[in-house]
């Protein structure tokens, strides 16, 4: 998770790539709205609307993404995580509806443990926009907490002894007191 740029930001109408969420049952009806070229692109990617599938669809000089989820009307914490992993860096917004609890998986899917080695080909942040501005701060805090725990778990014991754990606890206490 990037420290310098929040991965969840307020939707103020800025440019963003559309994310369409479909399920396997609703996909046949949804795909009828697309052009032949767009349907062919999804067929080439073997996209059927199954959970955690990601498709890229050409749209004139641009494109949009489609993700398979269990229920587009009731998103879970993890249903958009695969999109955050698979899509290129950029700014995204749901085409219909708000991401709701899926902001958690969107953020934590971008976690990279890079304390000892930098990624060979780092991927920039995938920012998700939401109109639910009141939920952003809590969602970011929760994702940061998860990523901190992942860092602690991924740090070898030789670098995370009692003194290092104490220092981490002191840092947290100072930040939140």
Q: What kind of region is each of these model predictions?
A:
Residues 1-177:
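N-terminal hydrophobic/helix-forming segments and targeting peptides
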């Amino acid at each position: 998770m990037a420290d310098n740029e929040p991965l969840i930001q307020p939707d103020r109408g800025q440019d963003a790539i559309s994310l369409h969420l479909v399920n396997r049952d609703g996909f046949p009806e949804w795909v009828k709205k697309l052009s032949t070229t767009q349907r062919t692109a999804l067929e080439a990617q073997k996209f059927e609307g199954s959970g955690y599938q990601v498709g890229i669809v050409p749209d004139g000089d641009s494109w949009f993404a489609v993700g398979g989820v269990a229920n587009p009307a009731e998103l879970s914490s993890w249903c958009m995580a695969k999109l955050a992993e698979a899509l290129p860096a950029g700014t995204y917004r749901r085409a219909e509806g708000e991401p709701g609890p899926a902001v958690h998986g969107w953020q934590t899917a971008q976690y990279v443990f890079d304390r000892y080695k930098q990624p060979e080909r780092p991927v920039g942040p995938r920012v998700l926009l939401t109109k639910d501005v009141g939920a952003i701060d809590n969602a970011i805090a929760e994702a940061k907490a998860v990523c901190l725990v992942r860092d602690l778990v991924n740090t070898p014991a030789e670098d995370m002894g009692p003194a290092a754990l104490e220092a981490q606890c002191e840092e947290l206490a100072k930040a939140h007191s």
